[in-house]
Design a protein with these regions (language model features):
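Anionic-ligand binding region
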Residues: 135-142, 173-198, 203-204
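Glycine-rich phosphate-binding loop signature in dinucleotide/nucleotide-binding domains
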Residues: 25-30, 116-117, 182-184
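Active-site neighborhood of phospho(di)ester-bond hydrolases with catalytic His/Asp-centered motifs
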Residues: 8-9, 33-38, 42, 60-64, ...
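Active-site environment of divalent metal-dependent phosphoester hydrolases
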Residues: 12-17, 41-43, 65-71, 129-130, ...
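Acidic, His/Gly-rich catalytic cores of divalent-metal-dependent hydrolytic chemistry
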Residues: 197-268
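Active-site neighborhood of divalent metal-dependent phosphoester bond hydrolases
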Residues: 56-114, 137, 142-145, 149-153, ...
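Beta-strand-turn-beta hairpins that frame and shape the catalytic cleft
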Residues: 1-6, 114-122, 200-204, 228-229
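N-terminal active-site segment of His-dependent metallophosphoesterases
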Residues: 1-56
């Protein structure tokens, strides 16, 4: 059966970028749209962004930005310790969302498994669990996919920082990739780092996608996966200067980081 899936990731409350890619998708006969996480966080328009996702039946997967809302930022001590503005942004983001929008975020799955034309595909924000793997999630440089070999279930909990032990217990009840090893899949597609990489580990294809709303480009980016095999990238012009102006005019935590990303396209 032919199937056409659109993939976005790391919108980061950039509603203008999301609007642009949705408009571009309209004539492409898309079956389903998946967001690979971080649809919120950083940007000034979390409510408008989530509303747009709901209205367009986007299936959103939880990333770390969603986890900061669903689990609460206090469950991630490194935020308050290392990035107080990101901590405050998580609280502010939560306060901007309506009950329906919060419900959408709370009910976002941590991963999705698809079988298309015999290909087993895992969709996630990152192949290591952003809810508790502090070390692995933040050190990846795009060069060492072997880091993804370990499982994300109770077998590994003791290896992680004690301060995130409670998070690991929560995550173990709803494990990333359903507790499977990456070798249980033919392909893993993910976001998180906002850069594009392609690796083959054993017989598994690992695709890292460019961010839709936060990327080293002035375009909004999305992908179409055709029949579980061909991954096509689309770059859509959008008014990022308007996003910069709106950022200047709105008062919200971590706005300087968002301005840097949008205007100068520097990632962290």
């Amino acid at each position: 059966m032919k199937k056409k899936i659109a993939l976005i990731t790391d919108v980061h409350a950039n509603v203008e970028a999301l609007q642009a890619v949705l408009l571009d998708m309209k004539d492409k006969n898309i079956d389903t749209i998946y967001s690979l996480g971080d649809i919120i966080g950083l940007g000034y328009a979390p409510s408008e962004t989530v509303r747009l996702a709901i209205d367009n039946n986007i299936i959103n997967i939880q990333g770390n930005a969603e986890a900061y809302v669903t689990m609460g930022p206090d469950m991630f001590p490194y935020l308050k310790r290392n990035n107080i503005e990101r901590y405050n942004n998580a609280i502010w983001t939560s306060e901007q969302l309506s009950a329906e929008e919060l419900d959408y975020i709370n009910n976002s799955p941590v991963s999705v498994e698809l079988v298309i034309n015999g290909n087993k595909i895992g969709l996630c924000h990152f192949p290591l669990d952003v809810r508790y793997d502090f070390i692995g999630v933040w050190k990846y440089d795009g060069k060492n996919p072997e880091e993804f070999l370990k499982r994300n279930t109770s077998d590994d909990i003791e290896k992680y920082k004690p301060e995130l032990y409670e998070n690991a217990k929560i995550a173990d009840k709803n494990p990333l990739l359903f507790g499977k090893n990456i070798f249980d899949f033919d392909r893993i597609i993910y976001g998180h780092y906002h850069f594009e990489r392609n690796h083959i580990l054993g017989n598994v294809i690992l695709d890292s996608l460019n961010g839709t709303g936060v990327a080293i480009t002035d375009k909004a980016i999305y992908y179409i996966l055709e029949n579980g095999a061909k991954l096509i990238k689309y770059e859509v012009p959008y008014d990022y200067e308007k996003v910069f102006r709106e950022t200047e005019e709105n008062d919200f935590p971590n706005k300087d980081t968002f301005k840097k990303v949008i205007r100068w396209r520097k990632l962290w």
